[in-house]
A protein has these predicted regions:
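Proline-aspartate-enriched helix->loop->beta-strand connector
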Residues: 187-188, 192-206, 325-341
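Short, Lys/Arg-enriched N-terminal segments with co-localized hydrophobic residues
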Residues: 29-48
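Short helix-initiation/N-cap motifs at beta->coil->alpha
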Residues: 125-127, 182-194, 317-325
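A short, structured surface patch at a secondary-structure boundary
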Residues: 141-199, 203
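Alpha-helical, coiled-coil/dimerization segments enriched in small aliphatic residues
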Residues: 293-320
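Bacterial lipoprotein signal-peptidase II cleavage site
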Residues: 69-80
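Secretory targeting and sorting signals
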Residues: 50-71
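Extracytoplasmic substrate-binding proteins
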Residues: 129, 213-291, 314-315, 369-436
Length: 437
């Protein structure tokens, strides 16, 4: 049974504060109606959101906007629903001028100024002030992960140039088949400027400094983005919404960040009482093709491990770092998670290699495939919001028995991508498997 945000607070053991559970209508409103100001103010007290790396509190205006769509049901339960479909109602027109959006822009540290004609000046991650056109119809998204952000913000159909990796990602193609029609001027980090120009983009997005310089030298409006932690993820979503410049994108950004914040809060509270000995040491391997390339504590991987009641077994190392097998053995991980769509290859090679056999995770068969959806859940992904729930339930199943990962995944895809996953499709994503067809 689902518990709505309007339900009375129940003091149950290890039960988190809950988001609203009302489904949004096509207009972005809960059909059940709105909340009284008094009720909303109480809800806000329960759900004040913080950006955990920066320590910036999101303001009451954002929270009130997020709760506008919650129904008035008083059904209570100890189930920890954090349904994506219930995170926030659609913000009214002219979102850019709304207090909720202004507060979110401020909280995430985004620098943006607006002109009367609808054009905008955005300060990108390189510190460059980029003047963006009032209307952005054609986008060259040269950063793999940010293609997923544009999918979430409702603008993936405007991507006219992308990367070879994204054009081949099975779940992205399943959700947005049009991505296969986009040109692919980027292979690895190499940019073919001539091919990029043929796509005639209004705006180019990239994480790579050299690509940005080449695109700007070719006379293209170019924005450099990127992030390494949850605070950066939220900032990146807001910046991308401003690149797109639509109310739909800004509304989706508010909705998504509200959902992400609630899931962060939920898993942290659910695992808060664990002692240090109860927090497993986890080794995260970037992909199955190279089992000594790991993601250490100084990364978003280390951040979600900490949030979900675990410790990264490789301390003081960033992501995608090659270390020795001896270092891995010495770190004695209690669990091993392998990322990427080739995760099973890595798990099989670990099990077949006698050098790994005395590692606690291997002896106790605690080897897991990371989920992979429209992008890898473990890094640079908007599906990090789901990954928090998966990691919590995987590493501490006894604490998360009431989390239905299939249901959460299906609702996330429906709410943020407009795609209705079947139960089998959701299970395949959670297992790190490609679509059946």
């Amino acid at each position: 049974m689902m518990l709505s945000a309007s339900s009375p607070v129940r003091h149950l053991k290890a039960t988190p504060l809950r988001p609203c559970s009302g489904r949004l209508s096509s207009a972005g409103r809960d059909p059940a109606g709105g909340e009284s100001l008094l009720r909303v103010s109480h809800i806000f007290e329960r759900y004040t959101m913080t950006t955990f790396r920066s320590g910036i509190a999101l303001t009451a205006a954002l929270m009130l906007a997020a709760l506008t769509g919650c129904g008035a049901s008083n059904t209570a339960s100890s189930s920890p629903s954090t349904s994506a479909s219930s995170s926030v109602s659609a913000v009214s027109s002219s979102v850019a001028s709304s207090q909720a959006w202004k507060d979110l822009v401020s909280a995430t540290g985004v620098e943006i100024t607006y002109s009367a004609d609808g054009s905008r000046v955005l300060t990108d991650n390189s510190g460059q002030k980029v003047e963006l056109p009032a209307t952005v119809d054609r986008i060259a998204n040269l950063w793999d992960a940010n293609n997923q952000v544009m999918l979430l913000l409702g603008s993936s159909n405007h991507i006219v140039a992308t990367t070879q990796q994204i054009s081949k990602m099975p779940w992205y193609k399943k959700v947005q088949p049009k991505i296969t029609q986009a040109s692919t001027p980027v292979s690895g980090t190499d940019l073919n400027v001539e091919e990029l120009l043929k796509a005639k983009p209004d705006v180019v997005v990239s994480i790579d400094k050299t690509q940005v310089e080449k695109a700007r030298a070719a006379g293209l409006t170019t924005v450099q983005l990127g992030f390494q932690d949850f605070a950066g993820l939220k900032k990146n979503v807001v910046m991308t919404a401003e690149v797109l410049g639509t109310d739909q994108a800004r509304s989706q950004a508010i909705k998504y960040i509200t959902y992400l914040e609630k899931n962060l809060k939920f898993v942290i509270e659910r695992t808060a009482s664990l002692s240090d000995d109860q927090r497993p040491k986890v080794l995260h391997i970037a992909g199955g093709s190279d089992v000594t390339k790991v993601d250490g504590s100084d990364s978003i991987i280390g951040e979600w491990m900490k949030a979900t009641g675990a410790k990264n077994s490789i301390d003081g190392v960033a992501n995608y770092k090659n270390i020795s097998l001896e270092q891995i053995i010495a770190s004695a991980p209690d669990a091993i998670i392998v990322g990427n769509s080739d995760a099973q290859q890595g798990i099989d090679s670990i099990k077949a290699d006698a050098a790994w056999k005395d590692i606690p995770a291997v002896k106790n068969d605690k080897l897991y495939r990371n989920p992979v959806g429209t992008f890898k859940w473990d890094r640079y992904s908007t599906e990090e919001a789901l990954h928090l729930l998966w990691a919590g339930k995987t590493l501490h199943p006894e604490l998360f028995t009431d989390v239905d990962l299939v249901k959460e995944t299906r609702e996330f895809y429906s709410t943020f991508y407009g795609y209705n996953l079947t139960e089998d499709e959701a299970q395949r994503i959670l297992a790190g498997q490609n679509p059946a067809s």
